Swiss-Prot record:
Hydrolase as UniProt keyword: yes
Assembly notes: Homodimer or homotrimer.
InterPro entries assigned: Aldolase/citrate-lyase_domain (IPR005000), Citrate_lyase_beta/mcl1/mcl2 (IPR011206), Pyrv/PenolPyrv_kinase-like_dom (IPR015813), Pyrv_kinase-like_dom_sf (IPR040442)
Annotated binding of substrate, by residue: 70, 122
Encoding gene, per UniProt annotation: mcl2
Main function: Catalyzes the hydrolysis of (3S)-malyl-CoA to (3S)-malate and free CoA. Inactive towards beta-methylmalyl-CoA and other CoA esters.
Protein name: (3S)-malyl-CoA thioesterase
Keywords from the UniProt entry: Hydrolase, Magnesium, Metal-binding
Binding site for Mg(2+): 122, 148
A single BP term in Gene Ontology: oxaloacetate metabolic process
Principal EC category: hydrolase
Length: 285
């Protein structure tokens, strides 16, 4: 897991063309917001959305929410102008769509020299090149684009996301190998709370830092699922205490609840506590 000073349990897409949605986002319980200029904006609204979002980011206070701008691709008529407009914007990262190889990030890096870059992982080629992409020195985050990936694969939706497992796993491996944040794809049925919870739990258990969301109604479940539970925090504290006590007696392992606790378990326990502390700090900010 990447060491984060900021949680990414809930990452909400907001269309850059919708002024009311941009205003409402100030009060939402999202850890991060993706201000979208790409898929969520119609072609005839692209230029308006760019201007509206630029002004909004300059004038609206989103508190400590992590602000990500998803631009249009460099192969479109809007991509370069998007990057030029937001190169020095009040954003925390620029999200590049449909990254298929590390070279896709080079032109963007030149136009946006100061902001961190995130990559949308949503093509078959991107899955196969995930390690190369994750190694790019400017990249700090990955976002799974499961809708576009499903379209490219020609796969049908199943609750276990069987067709997605290979791609999700490759991107997770790449992100963890290079210390990146990585968030899972969206769940389209925003009124299906049971289905959303199950998919959030699957993503959490796989190792994702959080989930991208398409509707504010999904925030509560994502935040809950991707937060360490009181039981997990209590266990982490007991594991650390038992291991430190064992070390004081010259032992390299401890036993907690009938299970061996080694150094690798302590690393995980400390990560659990660090995540809980980051969430608490974010809530208090």
């Amino acid at each position: 897991m990447a060491h984060q000073a900021h949680p990414f349990r809930s990452v909400l897409y907001i269309p850059g063309s919708k002024e009311r949605a941009l205003e409402k986002a100030q009060g939402l319980a999202a850890d991060a917001i993706i201000f979208d200029l790409e898929d969520a904006v119609a072609h005839d609204e692209k230029i308006h959305a760019r201007a509206l979002l630029k002004t909004t980011l300059e004038t609206v206070d989103y508190g400590h929410r992590f602000r990500i701008v998803r631009v249009n691709g460099m192969d479109t008529e809007w991509g370069r102008a998007d990057l030029e407009a937001f190169a020095e914007a009040k954003a925390d990262a620029i999200l590049i769509p449909k990254v298929s190889r590390a070279a896709d990030l080079e032109a963007v890096a030149a136009l946006v020299p100061d902001l961190p870059l995130w990559a949308m992982m949503e093509t078959a080629q991107g899955m196969l090149n995930a390690a190369e992409i994750a190694a790019h020195p400017r990249l700090t985050g990955m976002v799974m684009g499961t809708n576009d990936l499903a379209k490219e694969l020609g796969s049908r939706y199943r609750p276990d996301r069987l067709a997605m497992q290979a791609g999700l796993g490759l991107c997770l491996l790449a992100a963890r190998a290079h210390g990146l944040t990585i968030v899972d794809g969206v769940y389209n049925a925003f009124k299906d709370e049971e289905g959303l919870r199950a998919e959030c739990e699957q993503g959490r258990d796989m190792g994702f830092d959080g989930k991208t969301l398409i509707h504010p109604a999904q925030l509560e479940i994502a935040n809950a699922v991707f937060s360490p539970s009181p039981a997990e925090i209590e266990l982490a504290n007991r594991q650390i205490a038992a291991f430190e006590e064992a070390e004081r007696h010259g032992q390299g392992v401890a036993v907690v609840d009938g299970k061996i606790v080694e150094n690798l378990h302590i690393v995980t326990a400390r990560q659990t506590l660090a995540k809980a502390e980051a969430i608490a700090a974010f809530r208090a900010s």
